Amino acid sequence: MPEPLTPATPAELAEAVRSHPRVLAVGARTKPRLSQVPGDVALLSTRALRGIVEYEPEEFTFTALAGTPVREIAQALAEKGQYLPFDPLWLESGATLGGTVCAGTSGPGRFRFGGVRDFILGVRFVDGLGRLLRMGGKVVKNCAGFDLPKFLVGSLGRYGALAEVTFKVFPAPAARLTLKLKASGAEAAARVLTEAAASRWECEALDFLPDGRSVGLRLAGPATALEAVSREILARWPGQVLSPGEAQTIWTELREMRWAHAGGALVKVAITPNVIAALCTAVESLDSTRLHISAGGNVGFVSLSTGIPPAALQERLRGLGLPAVTLCGNAPLWCGARATPAIAGAVKQALDPQGRFPSTED
């Protein structure tokens, strides 16, 4: 496959789209399955399209070019005591802002404050006609094309090429505390997740860990309050408070997907807490398969070893009626049940009437 083109400005990105009959914008390709497209599709790398365009700490918003590594943004925010609460995945691996938006990937922190979709405010993007358009805005209270930026989250770049993105951010918490709670299995873990999610503890992150026998519960806020809440939680379930170093190791491994098999398929599954046990049973029959349940039981990540045929997982997910998308590896892009809403076709026709960007079937 030819090397991707590397436009360095939004105008160059628009020109590159107009110059090719079929295109797809890609970032750092930390989720490589999403950029596996037919050979006639020209890849447009956004790696040269990087930098923070505007950052207003007092307004809690920033605007950055799509190819900007999320790590650079996180560092700039940290200097002002702010952060992106949704725990962007593959942060240390070089994931870009545009790739994070198009993949719709969020980490454990999504549980309390929401995912990528809840923080995006506006975009500049190139549509299928090569027009550089702006939707949304640069302030929180804005209704200019408000829904379209959110619609682009998880779109896999099939509606246009992102050039610039505006996000809102939050003040960083004063302190964090992580508990590792014992769970004898999937059903027990599901009960812990459900009860903790409905509690008054305001958990920042709530995950069934890949070890299959424990729940990671992260709290954020004033240190004295966290200590009191942790005692209450440990009176309800057996477990322990982790040291800061132990906690950082766990959450970093989850965020960077280091728990997953290297080289195997990694599949993101949309779930609800009531199907956790069924999903665990389904994947346990696949040798060496690993599972991580995140966001309080609302998303699952399944990692297959290289020797397991993806069709086996696909069959089980379809049997459970669970939609899934493959992020890494050679499994089908849509690796589960799938129902495409009618609005998706209407938006595709409006933004890309010539089919310049790949269809969602590619």
Give the predicted meaning of each segment.
Residues 1-23, 46-93, 105-138, 173-181:
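N-terminal glycine-rich flavin-associated loop
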Residues 37-40, 47, 240-362:
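Conserved glycine-rich FAD pyrophosphate-binding loop
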Residues 176, 182-183, 191-243:
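A conserved active-site cap/scaffold subdomain adjacent to cofactor or substrate pockets
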Residues 3-6, 62-64, 177-182, 212-225, ...:
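Short cationic amphipathic helices and targeting signals
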Residues 71-73, 186-191, 224-231, 275-281, ...:
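Short, conserved charged micro-motifs
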Residues 86, 93-206:
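FAD-binding subdomain of flavoenzyme oxidoreductases
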Residues 24-31:
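Glycine-rich beta-strand-to-loop/alpha-helix junction loops that act as flexible
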